[in-house]
Amino acid sequence: VTETTAGDIRRLDPASAAADLRAAADTGRGFLGLDPVTQNDVLLAAELTRMQAQVFRAGDMLLGAVANPDQPRQAFVAATSADPAPLRAFLSFLGTRQRCTSFVAMVPDGAASVAAFERCGFRRVGALRDHRYQSGGYQDVVIYHASREDTCSA
C-alpha cells in the first residue's frame, strides 16, 4: 500500500489475518469487534470475510478497516500498537484511495493502540460502559472519531 518508517504495509487475506490476530494475543482483542483469544481461526476468517474487513500488516502492527454500512465514506478502524506512523499512513491510504472522510475507532479501555489514535488526531467522543467481557469481567470500550483533515494535520 505505502512505505512507512515501520516498513511496507501489506494487505492480508482473511486466513492470514486471523492467524496474525491470534498471534497478537491481548493486543488483538477488540480488533474490529473481534476476539482472537476466544474465537478460532476459521470463525475469525469467516467474520472478517462477512464484514468485508481489510486487514494489513506494518511491521509488528496490524491495521484494519471496515466500511460503515450507513455511511459509506466512514470507516471503522483498528490497530494493535501504539506506533502512530503506520496508522497515519493507513488512514492516508483510506482517505486517498477509498475516499473515506471520517474514521471511528472502538478501542478497549486501556489498550495500547489508544496512544496511536490520539497521536493521529482522534478525539474521544464517548464510551460504551461494560460493553466487552474479558477475563471474568466486563470492560468499557472507548469510542474515538477523526475526520480526514484531523488525521492529515496530526
Protein language model features and the residues they cover:
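Short hydrophobic/aromatic beta-strand or adjacent loop that forms the aromatic wall/cage
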Residues: 53, 139-143
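Residue-level detector of beta-propeller blades
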Residues: 11, 62, 124-128
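Conserved active-site alpha-helix within GNAT-family acetyltransferase domains
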Residues: 109-127
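Conserved GNAT acetyl-CoA-binding A-motif
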Residues: 96-108
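Glycine-rich acetyl-CoA-binding "A-motif" of GNAT/NAT acetyltransferases
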Residues: 59-62, 112, 138
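Acetyl-CoA-dependent GNAT
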Residues: 29-87, 93-94
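A short, well-structured alpha-helix characteristic of acyl/acetyltransferase catalytic modules
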Residues: 1-50, 150-154
